[in-house]
Structures are given as structure tokens and as C-alpha cells.
Curated annotation (Swiss-Prot):
PANTHER family documented for this protein: UPF0756 MEMBRANE PROTEIN YEAL
One Pfam family linked to the record: DUF441
Designated name of the protein: UPF0756 membrane protein Dred_1097
Keywords: Cell membrane, Membrane, Transmembrane, Transmembrane helix
Membrane topology: Multi-pass membrane protein
Length: 151
């Protein structure tokens, strides 16, 4: 059995044991694609999968805004509340960190392996959700920046 198949089966098993349907499903889909020799689709997924995933994530978050039953005055009040202002700051910092992570991944793409392993550890042991490598890369960029400050 090829090494990639063993790794994918391991991911499926880890997803099952950790009760992470996302990890198990992703492993299953990749294994089926691999066994079906859908290399072109895998290449497309590798190149554009993150963008497509982020589009669906953004859509799921923005759906409430598309409903007609939103009271915009309440929306503004919530946004200007202390929690809303913290959410604005959090969103601003998160997108900045994601941008820094993307720069880091372009400079040193080999770091993705450590981020994937770290994500798996977070899923299995901390009950985390694999939202994408950009946040992991952004945090890595922040950690590296802090280390450089102390050198």
C-alpha cells in the first residue's frame, strides 16, 4: 500500500477516534480521489481549495445579513457595543494575521507540514476546528516576529 494511502487512512481513523467529522470526511474524500486517480481534481483542490473553502465560510457567516428580518438599527447597536467593538478589533487583527501568514507560506511553504500536524493535534486533543492554514501561518508569523524581537 502506498504511503499516502496509509497517511489518509490514519487521518480518517484519527478523525473517527476524535469524533471530528471534518477530518474524517476530508480524509475519505482525498482517499477516494486518490484511488480514483483524480489527480487533476486534486491539483485544482490544492491550488484553489482554500479560496473556495473561504468563500463558503464567508457565505455561511453572511447568510443572516441576507435575510429580510434583520433590524439594521439593532445590528448597528450590537456592532457599537463593547462586545461588537472587540469583534471589530478581533476581525481586523485576524485578517491582518492571515495576510501575514500567507506571506510566510509564500516565503517558506515547507512550514505547512508543521501547521497541518499542529492542526491535527488541535483537532484530536483540544477539540479544535480546522478552519485553515492561514490562521496557523499567521500565528506562526507572529511567534517568529516575537522571537526575532528577542534576538
Amino acid at each position: 500500500m502506498q504511503r499516502a494511502n496509509i497517511i489518509l487512512l490514519s487521518l480518517i481513523l484519527m478523525g473517527y477516534l476524535a469524533e471530528s467529522a471534518l477530518l474524517a470526511t476530508a480524509g475519505c474524500i482525498l482517499l477516494v480521489m486518490r484511488l480514483s486517480k483524480l489527480n487533476r481534481l486534486m491539483f485544482l483542490l490544492e491550488r484553489r481549495g482554500l479560496e473556495v473553502g473561504l468563500i463558503f465560510l464567508m457565505l455561511s457567516v453572511l447568510v443572516p445579513l441576507a435575510h429580510d428580518n434583520i433590524v439594521y438599527k439593532e445590528l448597528v447597536m450590537k456592532t457599537l457595543s463593547p462586545q461588537g467593538l472587540l469583534a471589530l478589533i478581533g476581525g481586523t487583527l485576524a485578517t491582518h494575521m492571515n495576510g501575514e501568514g500567507l506571506k510566510l507560506l509564500k516565503l517558506d511553504p515547507q512550514l505547512i507540514f508543521g501547521m497541518v500536524i499542529g492542526s491535527l493535534i488541535g483537532i484530536v486533543f483540544l477539540g479544535g476546528i480546522p478552519i485553515g492554514p492561514l490562521m496557523a501561518a499567521g500565528l506562526t508569523a507572529l511567534f517568529l516576529e516575537v522571537i526575532y524581537w528577542f534576538k
